[in-house]
Regions:
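Conserved N-terminal Rossmann-fold NAD(P)-binding element of oxidoreductases
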Residues: 4-8
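Hydrophobic/small residue at the entry helix of a nucleotide-binding pocket
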Residues: 12
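Helix N-cap at the beta1-alpha1 junction of Rossmann-like dinucleotide-binding domains, i.e.
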Residues: 34-37
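Rossmann-fold cofactor-recognition segment
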Residues: 46-58
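Conserved Rossmann-fold cofactor-binding substructure of NAD(P)-dependent oxidoreductases
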Residues: 56-68, 80
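N-terminal Rossmann-like NAD(P) cofactor-binding module of classical short-chain dehydrogenase/reductase
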Residues: 70-75, 95-96
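Rossmann-fold NAD(P)-binding glycine/threonine-rich loop
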Residues: 99-127
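C-terminal catalytic/substrate-binding lobe primarily of soluble NAD(P)-dependent oxidoreductases
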Residues: 149-405
């Protein structure tokens, strides 16, 4: 029997806690959050859980909270990752998060650091740490590796995510607006011709026809983990891939791009009529928060859903048996209304949270037990098969097509 602490019980963390509450090999779940109300509300709905108010800015607080736990699930913002990793090592617990670190040394450099020094730390302690285990990064990486393994060599991997959910009530984001705007205003990363390249936000726009959308949609480069980790692991697990990019599109991207071009996502102080203002602070003050509780999501749905459309594609291109080959993996998952009917979650929380829960379950079930620090594209075939099988039970599936040309 295993004890799990979930630190950060927002949409993804709470989903994982609920799923693990039903797992027969889990004896106790600690729901820890700075927001005491959120922790207690979640714990009251789970028969194996207890609530804990936690300020994770101090590693000693995290160590004290996690003492005796077998696994730490980190649902906090990126800046907490290394703090929580340090605590996991201190209490001899395995570790999982849903996106990698972005330390001041740089996105690529921070991944190099955890792939080397932190991998060794977890390996020497006989522990497993999984980084970037949500939907994207996470499921996207598993799909990419699955496709690449069918090829002799791989040239290009592209991850394309389009989100177009329009509701009568203005709801620009279904996850933290602070994280969303911050990510979109950050420089982009891609892996190009065997090297990591940075670019300006919203760079290299393309029009694409994606399955399930009856028109071409605009997609732009976006800061994300996959080009970084896949580039670093290109020769080890992705058959020498030379190009990896992540493109994003949809209503939230379009809004953010307009605000960015107006300077409203800047964190530099400006003076307006003798008042000093940080534009990003103003935007975040005025932006509606993401719906957090079921009653909030239900209220938005009841007010009216105008349009639900989206696509999640992982495309790998390379060579197989002397011919050029393209393998497309389209993810199928419940939309907003269906996700809420199934689990009182938004579509965003359902896909990312349930994907994260399957990765956690994989550790609980010892379906992946290698020691050290890993990202999902490093999973062997058996672990990938486990992920696909368990996700299918949650109506998250992948349609794969292969085309030679």
């Amino acid at each position: 029997m295993k004890t799990i602490i979930v630190i950060g019980v927002g949409a993804q963390g709470s989903t994982i806690a609920k799923r693990m509450n039903d797992h027969p090999a889990v004896s106790e779940i600690i729901c820890a959050d700075f927001d005491s109300k959120a922790a207690h509300e979640l714990s009251r709905s789970l028969d194996k859980a207890k609530a804990l108010q936690l300020d994770a800015r101090d590693v000693n607080n995290v160590i004290k909270a996690a003492e005796g736990c077998d696994l730490i699930v980190n649902g906090l913002p990126l800046e907490f990752n290394l703090i929580v990793m340090e605590a996991a090592l201190a209490v001899h617990a395995s570790y999982l998060d849903m996106a990698g670190p972005m330390e001041s040394i740089g996105f690529v450099e921070s991944y190099k650091l955890i792939f080397s020094e932190w991998h060794k730390k977890f390996e020497e302690k006989g522990l497993t740490a999984l980084v970037g285990c949500g939907s994207s990064p996470g499921l996207a990486n598993v799909i990419a590796r699955e496709s690449v393994d069918k090829m002799d060599t791989c040239d290009t991997i592209g991850i394309f995510v389009y989100e177009g959910v329009w509701t009568e009530r203005f709801t620009p984001f279904w996850w933290s607006p602070e994280v969303a705007f911050g990510d979109m205003a950050f420089k982009t990363f891609r892996y190009e011709n065997g090297a990591h390249v940075t670019d300006r936000p919203f760079s290299r726009p393309v029009m694409m026809k994606l399955r399930g959308i009856d028109r071409e949609v605009r997609m732009v480069d976006h800061e994300h983990d996959e080009p970084v980790t896949m580039g670093l692991l290109a020769d080890k697990v992705l058959k020498g891939v030379k190009n990896v990019d992540f493109k994003y599109g949809g209503s939230g991207v379009e809004l953010a791009e307009v605000l960015y071009k107006m300077g409203l996502l800047s964190t530099d102080v400006v003076t307006v009529k003798d008042t000093r203002i940080v534009p990003m602070d103003l935007v975040l003050k005025l932006c509606p928060p993401a719906p957090k509780y079921p009653a909030e999501i239900k209220s938005i749905i009841d007010d009216g859903v105008i349009l639900e459309e989206g696509a999640f594609l992982v495309r790998a291109e390379g060579h197989k048996e002397g011919s050029a080959v393209r393998i497309d993996g389209y993810v199928n998952a419940p939309g907003l209304v269906e996700s809420f009917e199934k689990s009182n979650l938004s579509h965003e929380a359902y896909l990312t949270g349930q994907s994260g829960a399957v990765f956690v379950q994989m550790l609980v079930d010892d379906a992946f037990s290698e020691k050290g620090l890993f990202v999902p594209e490093q999973f062997p075939a058996a672990a990938r098969r486990y992920c696909f099988q368990e996700l299918a039970k949650l109506d998250i599936t992948v349609d794969e097509t292969e085309e030679s040309y």
